[in-house]
A protein has these predicted regions:
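Domain-level signal for soluble alpha/beta catalytic cores
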Residues: 1-127
Length: 127
């Protein structure tokens, strides 16, 4: 099961509820894993901290948008812009940090292209 968290606080869902409460609802269910998606990598660190206290495997698929908060107003993805500061090296570093904190599922969401995933794969398998 995947959740979207606030950009400013990865412990809160975009709708305002606590991530921890949502995870608790499904921790004893047949759901295989917990994921965070469509949030900036920096916000997901606090989500990873929350997910570590539950029994299911977990991970994250961050996006590379400047912000998705504008969707709350305009509800139109065409207004979203790609970040210029999230290069491949920084993305891979963020993913390795998640893995170091026990995430077993990592990848990318919007604006994270194949070259990012290829670099992540190479880093995981070559080190």
């Amino acid at each position: 099961m995947s959740f979207c968290v606030k950009e400013e606080d990865g412990t809160l869902l975009r709708s305002g509820e606590y991530l921890e409460d949502a995870l608790r609802e499904f921790d004893n269910s047949k759901i295989d894993s917990f994921l965070i998606n469509c949030a900036p990598p920096e916000a997901i660190h606090s989500s990873i901290n929350v997910m570590q206290s539950f029994s299911k495997p977990f991970g994250a698929l961050p996006n590379a948008f400047v912000t998705v908060n504008d969707l709350d107003i305009y509800n139109d993805v065409s207004i979203l812009k790609k970040r210029s500061d999230l290069n491949i090296h920084k993305f891979v570093g963020e993913m390795l940090s998640y893995i170091k904190n026990n995430a077993s599922i990592v990848g990318g969401c919007c604006e994270v292209g194949p070259q990012y995933i290829e670099a992540l794969k190479n880093e995981i398998f070559n080190n």
